[in-house]
């Protein structure tokens, strides 16, 4: 996360308060964006009013230097707007809302490692992997998409009040027989997330890094997460998915969850067998602000916004 601090705001609060706020940002490894004048003001405030721990922290802090890549993909927060909620914003872990966290979280937490040698975004995925390993990004079990908007509302009005949109990414299955249909069963969820219903929503509302409505979320382009595992991985577990391959709607939109022998608890095992090449072989490509990326890369960049 990048915290933007203006000189006017830095000067408007006590030096002790400024020292405490900046030390908190530094301690959790976030970036501080400011001009040179403001940086000197912050450093002097910590030097003159901060504790020895805060002063020592400032001496080793590297977060004033922010790459263009970080500015492009990390979330930027204006401290003046979130001054009263900074502690909550910094200290509470970010959450990934998952339909079945018990089995699917193994997949999501392994993706940054699987993509660690990614040529386009390896620095961003390294930050993401580090955050997950440190439990700064954790799973939130949704129990099915029907409960999502209620769970999001609840968190947004209680423990994560005023900051949850920046601390959560919701992910769920498409659950349709093709790539052009959006399920009316998800109308309440779609409307909550972006103000549109199934008949109005477009790919550009979903497969982007700047989503309308303020929430960060992702709906799998294929029918469900199961459709991203290739046939041979299922065969390794003794599950024959030939019927999916020969179906009218094709492998990507067949309900693999109903195939005889398949169980949801196989997802962690399937995930452990996947390589980057396995995921990229038949994945959808998107053009995001002139940059071509795969759906998995896009999903991981949505997770990066939580770092």
Each model region followed by its residue ranges:
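Non-catalytic accessory regions outside enzyme or core folds
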Residues: 1-53, 300, 307
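A short acidic, often aromatic-flanked loop/helix-cap motif at beta-alpha or helix-coil junctions
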Residues: 12, 145-149, 220-228
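RecA-like P-loop NTPase motor core
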Residues: 37, 42-176
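Charged/polar, solvent-exposed surface patches and flexible loops
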Residues: 44, 110, 150-153, 191, ...
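Short runs of predominantly hydrophobic/aromatic residues within well-ordered alpha helices
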Residues: 104, 225-226, 296
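Activity-critical C-terminal alpha-helical subdomain
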Residues: 171-279
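Hydrophobic, glycine-enriched assembly/anchoring segments
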Residues: 271-307
């Amino acid at each position: 996360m990048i915290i933007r601090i203006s000189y006017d705001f830095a000067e408007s609060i006590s030096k002790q308060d400024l020292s405490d706020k900046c030390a908190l940002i530094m301690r959790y490894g976030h970036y501080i964006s400011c001009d040179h004048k403001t940086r000197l003001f912050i450093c002097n405030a910590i030097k003159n009013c901060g504790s020895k721990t805060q002063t020592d922290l400032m001496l080793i802090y590297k977060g004033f230097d922010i790459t263009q890549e970080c500015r492009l993909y990390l979330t930027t927060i204006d401290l003046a707007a979130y001054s009263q909620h900074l502690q909550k914003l910094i200290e509470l872990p970010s959450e990934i809302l998952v339909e079945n966290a018990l089995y699917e979280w193994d997949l999501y937490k392994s993706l940054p490692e699987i993509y660690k040698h990614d040529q386009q975004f390896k620095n961003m995925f390294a930050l993401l992997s580090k955050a997950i390993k440190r439990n700064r990004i954790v799973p939130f079990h949704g129990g099915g998409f029907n409960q999502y908007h209620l769970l999001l509302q609840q968190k947004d009005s209680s423990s994560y009040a005023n900051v949850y949109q920046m601390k959560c990414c919701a992910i769920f299955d498409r659950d349709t027989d093709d790539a052009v249909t959006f399920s009316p069963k998800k109308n309440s969820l779609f409307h909550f997330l972006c103000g549109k219903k199934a008949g109005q929503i477009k790919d550009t509302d979903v497969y982007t890094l700047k989503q309308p409505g303020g929430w960060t979320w992702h709906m799998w382009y294929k029918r469900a997460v199961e459709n991203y595992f290739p046939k041979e991985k299922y065969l390794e577990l003794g599950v024959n998915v030939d019927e999916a391959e020969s179906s009218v709607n094709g492998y990507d939109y067949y309900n693999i969850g109903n195939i005889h022998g398949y169980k949801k608890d196989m997802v962690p095992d399937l995930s452990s067998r996947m390589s980057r090449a396995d995921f990229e072989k038949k994945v959808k490509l998107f053009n995001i602000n002139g940059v071509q990326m795969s759906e998995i890369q896009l999903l991981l960049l949505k997770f990066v916004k939580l770092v």
